């Protein structure tokens, strides 16, 4: 892979803040931090476009005592067999469970799955986290 050097003009205060943050995060140089930001920018753009293949997790915290929430979660997961790769279930306490659903597919479809799962009655909190599949990232 060929590396290209280019210059960027930014306000001094912005660069100082950027340098402070990348040092806190343990980056060895600005180049690697900028490459990570560029990759993230590309992944988010592809996600918004909706037609690119992405991977991700849908994390949900729910009360399993809530009427039908477990059945509805399982039914919805079976509706998306092609996109749902796996799920992990953790008992948080006697009432609350954490479910992490690992997904892969077209961004629009993954967003649809997350919207349906996270809107179920009994789901207290949840979040969709998207990333690329790695195929198009350098």
UniProtKB/Swiss-Prot annotation:
Amino-acid positions noted as binding Ni(2+) in the UniProt annotation, renumbered to this chain: 78, 89, 91, 97
Cell wall biogenesis/degradation listed as a keyword: no
CDD domains for this protein: RHH_NikR_HicB-like
Needed cofactors: Ni(2+)
Cofactor comment: Binds 1 nickel ion per subunit.
GO biological process terms, semicolon-separated: regulation of DNA-templated transcription; response to nickel cation
Highest taxon listed in the record's lineage: Archaea
Example GO molecular function: DNA binding
Record's keyword terms, sorted: DNA-binding, Metal-binding, Nickel, Transcription, Transcription regulation
HAMAP family xref list: NikR (MF_00476)
Record's function text: Transcriptional regulator.
Protein family per UniProt: Belongs to the transcriptional regulatory CopG/NikR family.
Protein name: Putative nickel-responsive regulator
Taxonomic source organism: Thermococcus kodakarensis (strain ATCC BAA-918 / JCM 12380 / KOD1) (Pyrococcus kodakaraensis (strain KOD1))
Lineage: Archaea, Methanobacteriati, Methanobacteriota, Thermococci, Thermococcales
């Amino acid at each position: 892979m060929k590396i290209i050097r280019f210059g960027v003009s930014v306000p001094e205060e912005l660069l100082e803040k950027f340098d402070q943050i990348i040092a806190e995060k343990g980056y060895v140089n600005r180049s690697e931090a900028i490459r990570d930001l560029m990759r993230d920018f590309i992944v988010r753009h592809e996600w918004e476009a909706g037609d690119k293949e992405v991977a991700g997790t849908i994390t949900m915290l729910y009360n399993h005592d809530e009427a039908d929430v477990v059945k509805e979660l399982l039914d919805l997961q079976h509706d998306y067999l092609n996109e749902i790769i796996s799920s992990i279930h953790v008992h948080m306490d006697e009432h609350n469970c954490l479910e992490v659903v690992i997904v892969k597919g077209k961004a629009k479809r993954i967003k649809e799955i997350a919207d349906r799962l996270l809107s179920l009655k009994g789901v207290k909190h949840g979040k969709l986290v998207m990333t690329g599949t790695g195929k198009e990232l350098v």
